[in-house]
Amino acid sequence: MDTPENVLQMLEAHMQSYKGNDPLGEWERYIQWVEENFPENKEYLITLLEHLMKEFLDKKKYHNDPRFISYCLKFAEYNSDLHQFFEFLYNHGIGTLSSPLYIAWAGHLEAQGELQHASAVLQRGIQNQAEPREFLQQQYRLFQTRLTETHLPAQARTSEPLHNVQVLNQMITSKSNPGNNMACISKNQGSELSGVISSACDKESNMERRVITISKSEYSVHSSLASKVDVEQVVMYCKEKLIRGESEFSFEELRAQKYNQRRKHEQWVNEDRHYMKRKEANAFEEQLLKQKMDELHKKLHQVVETSHEDLPASQERSEVNPARMGPSVGSQQELRAPCLPVTYQQTPVNMEKNPREAPPVVPPLANAISAALVSPATSQSIAPPVPLKAQTVTDSMFAVASKDAGCVNKSTHEFKPQSGAEIKEGCETHKVANTSSFHTTPNTSLGMVQATPSKVQPSPTVHTKEALGFIMNMFQAPTLPDISDDKDEWQSLDQNEDAFEAQFQKNVRSSGAWGVNKIISSLSSAFHVFEDGNKENYGLPQPKNKPTGARTFGERSVSRLPSKPKEEVPHAEEFLDDSTVWGIRCNKTLAPSPKSPGDFTSAAQLASTPFHKLPVESVHILEDKENVVAKQCTQATLDSCEENMVVPSRDGKFSPIQEKSPKQALSSHMYSASLLRLSQPAAGGVLTCEAELGVEACRLTDTDAAIAEDPPDAIAGLQAEWMQMSSLGTVDAPNFIVGNPWDDKLIFKLLSGLSKPVSSYPNTFEWQCKLPAIKPKTEFQLGSKLVYVHHLLGEGAFAQVYEATQGDLNDAKNKQKFVLKVQKPANPWEFYIGTQLMERLKPSMQHMFMKFYSAHLFQNGSVLVGELYSYGTLLNAINLYKNTPEKVMPQGLVISFAMRMLYMIEQVHDCEIIHGDIKPDNFILGNGFLEQDDEDDLSAGLALIDLGQSIDMKLFPKGTIFTAKCETSGFQCVEMLSNKPWNYQIDYFGVAATVYCMLFGTYMKVKNEGGECKPEGLFRRLPHLDMWNEFFHVMLNIPDCHHLPSLDLLRQKLKKVFQQHYTNKIRALRNRLIVLLLECKRSRK
């Protein structure tokens, strides 16, 4: 009879001459022959399996072959250290795509009590998409079920086997019945992989336990039985570890101690592995970014050199940035005069002559402040004060007055500590005074002289550069009203501008809003541009450890009255990210609705109450960005974070325009000097948290833009020209009026009446369950996809946006990144608008708008899966220029982006859709902006996002108009504030406000002069002045809903200027912006 050794020699000789494609098949037949003919010769089988592994270890063809994996697992049954053996297989790539390997590995770890490690092994198999996948997922679910059942300590103790006893039993019975014993061992080990133990092994194991017992001594009670079968006596346990002095530990206590030590070690090992993987990924990505930045630097250097050689000197002078140059003092005085009404110019003189007669209403106002802050219900009943007719101004914030002319000099040397609530932002707190939008340049070298605020940009001295970074940002933080007994008297104005700047630099006192009250403001430095928390439009976050420097667009101080010093407002860490979004559709931070006065409660602590009763002649309308509607004497606020509402008495009307009576109507003279506050309230205005995450209201005061008058005849005749070239043509006369197009009931009715419901879309999935828990650094099942959530991009009150990945996390090339917009309650409207927009647009235009891949609707929320944009919003790009010498975006880029915006809105309107929420942080930059090389489309990569406020005009009768105010957006159009009907005008205004942000780095405020709306900061030193005057005149002065300007004609005029001046420069400007974006992205890692 042939022996196995002889057959093996024959096999080896055969394999040397074998030329087939499957050598493993020959080995398989030989091993089967050995198992059938020599079942008891286990030692030879182990040697044969070891020889087989060495033969095929380096052959990648068989690494995931089921036959080879099965032999590896069979060899593992005879291995003493299974965990090390499985790691050896995995590190050599054997079985990485095979489910049996992971199941066997996890089964061994589970038997050892290493449940967390076992779970990690199964998860790794699922991530690697091991086959068969269904079987692996089933075993993972069974493992989780067993895990929940073994949480009780008693169950954990009874379910864990005594491995030493099993080994001893096997050794005792090995000679008496070796065949059956080995079969039992094989079955037991197989049961660890499958979770099922055969009854035969149970029976034999029970019989063996009756033979061997555990004793405190090192010898078994039935030692004679062991001696008969010539088996060495094995010590069951170490007495030194259990018996210590007079006390004795139990096995459970010893096992628990070892388990805790092993668990801590495994946790440390896992953390170290995770850290190394993350470090390698970051290093790889940083290397790619560095290579790309080096290439861009080289291209930028080459383009700049060529552009400097071809640039005429005259052209350079015409394009000097307005923030960096300024006329002489004499020219400033000459330019200042036409900007102010006659009453304003006479006010300082009159106040100097009789300073104690100027503020006759100060005591009543001071009392009204205290009453309003302590008891809002009482303050609302106080009658309005006498209007300050002599102090009406056109300034964007307030006029400065004083009781004593000498107090200016006195305040220059005195610093009054702020006693109000401190706002903790970052590592330090700056305390400055809230100022007007006069560009007051602090220059402390001028000494103690009185001054008048300057209305134009001063010369770029060293002090000016310091002041620009200082003053520019003090309006960039929210106002928290505090109870105050401050009744300091007003400060007077003088004619010397420089002394006022010096006084402003050193003193923390400032007069109140509209020249009535004083406000103490503290400048916060720990959060960035337009930041109101992690908001859902996932702009690119700024680095957390940003060096101290010039403030950026959106930083604001906290304005309040002096109050008791113990009150403190906690700092919100979410404000360290500039991924902002305005206008979440379900935003509760809304102004009061006339239809539901019962929704409002009494005033709360965070309610921002007016510092004084504003006279009707002084303020026409005050609007806080996105959150606030101001009334004539009282203001209303909804705190969306706590859903606490603060409103005036229920008897009054809530709309600021509807509230006015005919007696309160402004005369034409006073109206021409009043201001429409379109994006920020006065210092006494209402403040709320814009993004539902804190008490921040992102509002700005224009401190850098010089105020100048337009030539009276500069834009004569433009009205007729633009109205004749309307892009939408003449709209039919409205035959249908809708109050609020964003009403939840109306939207539900519109969605219910669709001929093709949203639920019928192929990429819409409805789940009859609640929204799963979605957290960073976790994975969850979304339909048939296993999604891994990386981190939170932005967060609002009702929506969070996460960056997620589908696919292998370790495979950087094949993994697909996207965003998850999670909303509670569900919001199918935004998905409907996005889908309709893609259907109505031409395929070549779809890349300019955000695309949703799918929508998952749950019972209590929704998840929208959309395209990921990696380089932040246009708002972030605007802020990046704050740390550059020019401080604002270059003109070439502004015109390029403006042309792209006009084209986007034209396409949206052609689809009969109103976006409804145009603003800088709803334009986002993707990879296309870095990769595109088209000469004619250098603003490619810019996309429009956030369709939650959009309106589908096809669902309404033709010519429908709306009357509601866009209460969830700070960019309210002129028609809303003047109580006129509107439809497409809201997008026109949004584009104008966004372009203004790019030009000046501040929010736009509009004034009405003689019935014509103009941006408050105009543009005396701005290049292409005529073009921008015409642009803002067309976008802000739309007669009605029937005659809309032509966006295409306006875009062609911008294109003409662009081609004349910036064709040779735009690529260098774009490359520089790319470098800034890449550096910003790398710095936040």
From Swiss-Prot:
CDD domains: STKc_Bub1_vert. The lineage of its organism: Eukaryota, Metazoa, Chordata, Craniata, Vertebrata. Autophosphorylated when the cells enters mitosis. ATP binds at residues 793-801, 821. Residues 458-476 are annotated as: Essential for loading of BUBR1, MAD1L1 and MAD2L1 to kinetochores. Its EC number is 2.7.11.1. The modification Phosphothreonine is found at residue 609. The gene is BUB1. Induction: Inhibited by phorbol 12-myristate 13-acetate (PMA). Interacts with BUB3 and KNL1. Interacts (when phosphorylated) with PLK1. The BUB1-BUB3 complex interacts with MAD1L1. (Microbial infection) Interacts with SV40 Large T antigen; this interaction induces activation of a DNA damage response and promotes p53/TP53 stabilization and phosphorylation. Residues 787-1085 form the Protein kinase domain. Residues 1-146 are annotated as: Necessary for kinetochore localization. This is Mitotic checkpoint serine/threonine-protein kinase BUB1. Residues 11-182 form the BUB1 N-terminal domain. Belongs to the protein kinase superfamily. Ser/Thr protein kinase family. BUB1 subfamily. A motif (KEN box 2) lies at residues 625-627. Keywords: Apoptosis, ATP-binding, Cell cycle, Cell division, Centromere, Chromosome, Chromosome partition, Host-virus interaction, Intellectual disability, Kinase, Kinetochore, Mitosis, Nucleotide-binding, Nucleus, Phosphoprotein, Primary microcephaly, Serine/threonine-protein kinase, Transferase, Ubl conjugation.
